């Protein structure tokens, strides 16, 4: 158990993060969401989250957001460029800033959304950057859980009509094994990791079927 204090969700206005916020609130947790200045947070505010304005590129804003917080969950990712302000530096400098702030703030549980096979793919930047974030958590001794999901099924099913046709459309090599996870399932895993026992510093768990 991490304690009675709020959980800070980083990336809480995104597709995955907003579901994490919902799962935590449903489970009776107090939720604080880090939201960039100017970004719309009305959706998660309506759910019951409190908003801390800050930016992963501004370390002092992270410390302010973590004041009184017992756990941090991050689903932030910059490489996708899904929203204004997204940048690959979120995955490098931003993640390191977040981990460093968690260490300084004495966070009792840090839950990282990593990615499957990140430790085997140094030539794939957004995979490898997750591995570097895991390494930084371990280096600083921050109690953490890193979940390594595969691809989101919701993103794959946007192509064609897979349910009526009985097949998925995928762009890539036909010889590379694939693994998928529902974002709603992953949100549940991330929320549950806040209070999971016997996992601090234990490394990473795959969410989904391993290739």
Where do the protein language model's features map onto the residues?
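Conserved dinucleotide-binding and phosphotransfer motif residues
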Residues: 27, 47, 140
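NAD(P)H-binding glycine-rich loop region in Rossmannoid oxidoreductase-like domains
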Residues: 8, 35-97, 101-104, 118-119
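Glycine-/Pro-rich loop/turn segments that contact NAD(P) or position catalytic residues
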Residues: 78-165
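Conserved sequence/active-site signature of Rossmann-fold short-chain dehydrogenase/reductase
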Residues: 57, 152, 209-211
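N-terminal Rossmann NAD(P)H-binding glycine-rich loop of SDR-like oxidoreductase domains
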Residues: 2-29
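Substrate-positioning beta->alpha
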Residues: 171-195, 201-202, 208
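Structural signature of the Rossmann-like NAD(P)-dependent dehydrogenase/reductase core
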Residues: 9-10, 74, 109-112, 146, ...
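Short beta-strand "acidic-cap" motif of Rossmann-like dinucleotide-binding folds
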Residues: 31-33
């Amino acid at each position: 158990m991490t304690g009675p204090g709020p959980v800070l969700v980083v990336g809480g206005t995104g597709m995955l993060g907003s579901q994490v916020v919902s799962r935590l609130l449903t489970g009776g947790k107090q939720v604080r969401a880090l939201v960039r200045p100017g970004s719309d947070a009305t959706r998660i505010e309506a759910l019951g989250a409190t908003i801390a304005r800050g930016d992963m590129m501004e370390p002092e804003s992270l410390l302010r957001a973590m004041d009184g917080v017992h756990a941090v969950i991050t689903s932030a990712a910059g490489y996708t460029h899904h929203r204004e302000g997204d940048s690959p530096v979120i995955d490098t400098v931003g993640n390191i800033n977040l981990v460093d702030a968690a260490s300084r703030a004495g966070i009792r549980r840090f839950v990282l959304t990593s990615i499957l096979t990140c430790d085997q793919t140094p030539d794939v930047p957004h995979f490898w950057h997750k591995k570097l974030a895991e390494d930084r958590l371990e280096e600083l001794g921050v109690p953490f859980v890193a979940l390594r999901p595969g691809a989101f099924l919701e993103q794959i099913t946007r192509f064609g009509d897979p349910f009526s046709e009985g097949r998925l459309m995928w762009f890539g090599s036909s010889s590379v094994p694939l693994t998928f996870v529902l974002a709603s399932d992953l949100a549940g895993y991330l929320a549950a990791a806040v209070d999971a026992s016997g996992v601090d510093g234990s490394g990473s768990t795959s969410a989904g079927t391993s290739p």
